[in-house]
């Protein structure tokens, strides 16, 4: 008997030990961030990369707060012999299973094809929900951009910024080929990427087939030909929608003839039935118990309706040509490119169609493009037509090199777009 008791005591002690081990196995937020910081140091030593102090300090700061760090920023360090690399941070995130990253900024760090492929493999993992990706001035080539584009089929990035990477038309084609099957990307920035007129058609197809509603293309070489190819389908779609809206309004204002005839026939039938003989129906007044039961049932039904009304599911972004912001400043939209001298007027006439009919358009930037007096006149008439159609006003910015009265009217009807302040430490670089 005493031996049996000892066994039970031993069993209880073993269960307590296992419970303690299980509690120790659970990681807190601070422990997870501490492990991430230590792993980042280890990976930097293994790959001979400079451990960026700002990354370590930001991890330590959130470790003390016991909050998840969502934003990671990488930029060149002070040590030239030991450069900052991207792979140590990504390896540390993967080894610690840190899935709370949402924003990744990489500035002025040269990225080879291997680095871009490592980043693409990281984004293809479904558990890392990166929503904002910024790769600014990283010397990404056209072949590497194609590999990055293939990763956007499986990730949930909503904003992609690839400014100051000279990958040209070939890289733009590879990137857009991968983005065609993406349904989450909303903002695309390709400022100063050496894009030519051929990229206009590629970007136009992208805007009509995906959910991208904001595009930033400042400092490229699209010229009139590229811009026309890009917005041609958008303008046609906006015009078709305007016609459909007008038809719906006409149908709502004019009542259908069939409904009027049906109402008259119903009224005549009820009057004829009222004149005929009817047997009186005896209705019993409900008792107090029945009344209380009815009121309770009504209250229950109302409560259920309130609960169901609170649950609102966010709909995914609309796929199609729903453009809201177009930034094409400094793109050579003038009469000096290939084509006739009227090419800026033709381009502005197409933009006029888009501005006049699109109900979702909010912003257009045409600064540093010599569109001329005729082009400015087309834009002014577009703003006036939009006002007559009672659509929401848009922000429009153009060059001042045109007729002074035309420019003043453009500022009056389409002003409001402010120049964004340049970020400290990044002179000359424009951010979204």
Which sequence ranges carry the predicted segments?
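Leucine-rich tandem repeat or coiled-coil scaffolds
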Residues: 1-432
